[in-house]
Amino acid sequence: MATDSSMPGTVIGKAEFSDTKAASEFGTDLSRWRLNVDNGRHMWEYLESEDEARKRPQSFLEKYWLGLPYELPARPRATCALEAVENGWEFFKRLQTADGHWGCNDDGPLFVTSGMVIARYIVGIPIDSHMKQEMCRYLLNVVNEDGGWGLFIQSPSTVFGTVMNYCMLRILGLGPEHPAMAKARNTLHRLGSARATPTWGKFWLCVLGVYEWEGMVPLPPEPLLVPASLPFNPGKWWVHTRNVYISMSYLYGHRFSMPPNKLVQALRDELYDIPYQQINWPAQRTNVSAADRLTDPTWIQRSFTSALTMYETFKIPFLRRRALNEALFQIETETRNTHYLCIAPVSFASNMLALYHAHGRDSHWIRGMRDRFIDPMWLCREGLAASGTNGTSLWDTALTVQATIDAGLAARPENQAILRKALEFIDNSQIREDPLGVHHVYRQPTRGAWPFSTRDQSYAVSDTTAEAVKVIVLLQRIEGFPSRISDERLQQAIDLILGMENAGGGFSAYEPVRGPKFLELLNITELYENVMTDNLYPECTSSVIMCLTTFAREYPTYRPRDIQACLSRSIDYLLRSQYPNGGWFASWGVCFTYATMFALQGLACMGWNESNCAACQRACSFLLQHQNPDGGWGESLDTVRFKQYLPHPDGSQVTNTAYAVIGLLAARCGNHEAIRRGVAYLVKEQQDTGEWLPGPLEGVFAPPGGMRYPNYKFHFTLMALGRYVAIHGNECLAI
């Protein structure tokens, strides 16, 4: 960051990022890209003509996310927490979109975009040339030094990541002799070639026609016919696993593959270390590279695979037909309920292929999904890639509003127009009805819920609903804000939240846990853990506690006994889920610092803190134990896999420091000096523009996968600084 001497009082900012040499040849003119939004929806558009670009100048928001230079009025560098809050907010408020929300990419997994590109190629829908270029640029910016790709960005190369993205780049037009492709191919062969890809990769290669279905672990659709009360029915599984499995089983049951063409024939030669015709396909079913496999298969998993193979040999034709019809019904209803989005891009891609097989390319199903292809795509500094969902619109907006309330910014007249727009977006995002066929298609009721992303996506999430209700109650009682969301609608949301509680207390994300934990013994993904059923999460539970206590103060006569009973059980869950080290373990953020922040806030809502609660004392000791000499905290994503706190190799990180400070403040930790040092670190890391720079992956999705949540460095940091000022005052910090 630097001050431009030709423009007094102006700071010129630019992301500290540059393309790799391989990626630079694919870049488009980034000054031509514009972001269109509609009720949380994101659609990046390339303006073809100079006249169009001139008539619609690029916004600050667009320049920031693309990594282009931007201009801001210069502000004095902060020397205290309140000044840092004001500088940070002056920057972050400019990232609000025209429809009132804060959005961003939540990319990270390196198989999401490739699945969507493969599906679109098979269906025969061309991709715009500028999008193709930016997709290539992204992959060549995040490629590993050995030329391969991992399960997610910043992870070691795997067969799955490398083969999926190799196929994607070939589809997008890169030739086999391109240096990047030759290097990727060498890594792929060194790791075992495409023969050693996990089941998920084998599926995508099968539908593309570059792998044979006999080499797949069977994915029969018949579990859909099992009584819904039994754990083997997909309705008992985690919602993402369920959605992916249903469409995969449909395509497996039909042995759907793209007819061979020149590219398919070429890939059959390029992906393998032995001739395609000589491969013993049944022997490849359990051939998974050590680089991909999370754990060795158990005897139960091996026996389960053998049983599936035997069943496939002796399957009953009329049951198979019924099961395939049921799978198609489930896919159609999912697509209809989500307005052609599907719960996430991963199942969007496989659902698109199933609907293409059933109804053809000219059907309304494919036309609708073609128009939704752009929704999860985000053009970031590295290029264009699909996010894990169709965005984070509601989640990030609710957290941003909470940050402004905590920092005392919401009550300031100059901020109310911005926050009224945010409130309007939150208002428009509430889901007002249940899904069609709610019970038949295993959906959780959604009437009154708020989604993670957009209303069209239509899935209820416990913590996003809780965070939305909390900020609505807090914001609507500040003078100057309209009561847009009625008491009745808030009560519907509370009813929904109470209905999502698990037996014995605690909250999952999308729906209460439905299946027994032994289902994890049958996990054949090879890539992930704890993905067969939903789980209890301290993060979600704590958000609900904060929501219910906030709501109960404002509406003390609405279901007080039910709310109090839920709060009591939720606290019990938090206490029994605390780790022996004193922290709580997160499944959605990194990791102990993230969950411990939430848990301490939840306990604080019930009046528990370091002075009167042994759990809070242990948690404070845990956080203080891991503070770095510079005052910050830095936790590695590897913590997710190894289940123990691992310091980040690059030292302190802004997000982890913000989490720790928020947790210690919530617990009323008596070590004021440690908190002050953490706050000083956050102030020191702030740039002249008021921003905080991007860091390592902030989020987790399906352990051990990492994801980006780039807005976390803004709203959690603003929360930490604002709460520090509210509790300890605005003292000058020695930076």
From Swiss-Prot:
InterPro entries given for it? Answer: SQ_cyclase_C, SQ_cyclase_N, Squalene_cyclase, Terpenoid_cyclase/PrenylTrfase
Q: Which GO terms describe its biological process?
A: (17Z)-protosta-17(20),24-dien-3beta-ol biosynthetic process; ergosterol biosynthetic process; helvolic acid biosynthetic process; secondary metabolic process
State the Gene3D superfamilies in the record: 1.50.10.20, 6.20.120.20
- Top-rank taxon: Eukaryota
Q: Where is the active site?
A: 463 (proton donor)
What EC number(s) does this enzyme carry?
5.4.99.32
Q: Where are the PFTB repeats?
A: 132-173, 490-531, 567-607, 616-663
Question: How would you classify this enzyme at the top EC level?
Answer: isomerase
This entry's Gene Ontology molecular function terms read:
lanosterol synthase activity
SUPFAM superfamilies attached to this UniProt entry: Terpenoid cyclases/Protein prenyltransferases (SSF48239)
Q: Which GO terms describe its cellular component?
A: lipid droplet
UniProt keywords (A-Z) are: Isomerase, Lipid biosynthesis, Lipid metabolism, Repeat, Steroid biosynthesis, Virulence
Q: Which reaction does it catalyse?
A: (S)-2,3-epoxysqualene = (17Z)-protosta-17(20),24-dien-3beta-ol
Q: What induces it?
A: Expression is under the control of the secondary metabolism regulator laeA. Expression is down-regulated when gliT is deleted and up-regulated upon exposure to exogenous gliotoxin.
| Involved pathway(s) | Mycotoxin biosynthesis
Q: Which family does it belong to?
A: Belongs to the terpene cyclase/mutase family.
Q: What does this protein do?
A: Protostadienol synthase; part of the gene cluster that mediates the biosynthesis of helvolic acid, an antibacterial nortriterpenoid. Protostadienol synthase helA cyclizes (3S)-oxidosqualene to (17Z)-protosta-17(20),24-dien-3-beta-ol (protostadienol). The synthesis of protostadienol is followed by several steps of monooxygenation, dehydrogenation, and acyl transfer to yield the final helvolic acid.
Protein name from the UniProt record: Protostadienol synthase helA
